[in-house]
Regions:
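Active-site-proximal helix/loop segments of hydrolytic enzymes
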Residues: 1-89
Length: 89
C-alpha cells in the first residue's frame, strides 16, 4: 500500500494489515510515494497493490476469483473500520 500523505497513513496501515491477514501474502508494509495519482487529490489517498504479476505465485492468485474476493473484502473492511462504520457481510 502506498501513500504520499501523512493524513492517509492510518488508513493505509489498516488496509495493509487487513490485506496481508486475509490473503496470506507477505506484509510489505506501507510506503510513501510521490505518484501523481496520490499527490494530485483533494482528499487523503492510498494506492493498493494487491499483488505483482512479476511474481509467478501472485500472478496466479490474481487470476483466482476467490483470492480477488478476499482482497476486495479486506480492503472494504479496512476502509469501514477507518471510518468507524460497522461492517456487514
Amino acid at each position: 500500500v502506498l501513500t504520499s500523505d501523512s493524513q492517509a497513513l492510518p488508513l493505509a496501515q489498516k488496509v495493509q494489515a487487513q490485506l496481508a491477514g486475509a490473503t496470506g501474502l507477505a506484509d510489505r508494509g506501507v510506503k510513501m510515494a510521490d505518484f501523481a495519482v496520490l499527490r494530485q487529490t483533494d482528499m487523503p489517498a492510498i494506492l493498493v497493490e494487491v499483488g505483482f504479476i512479476s511474481n509467478p505465485r501472485e500472478e496466479q492468485l490474481l487470476k483466482e476469483e476467490t483470492f480477488l474476493d478476499k482482497a476486495a473484502v479486506a480492503i472494504a473492511q479496512a476502509i469501514a473500520a477507518h471510518l468507524n462504520h460497522p461492517w456487514k457481510n
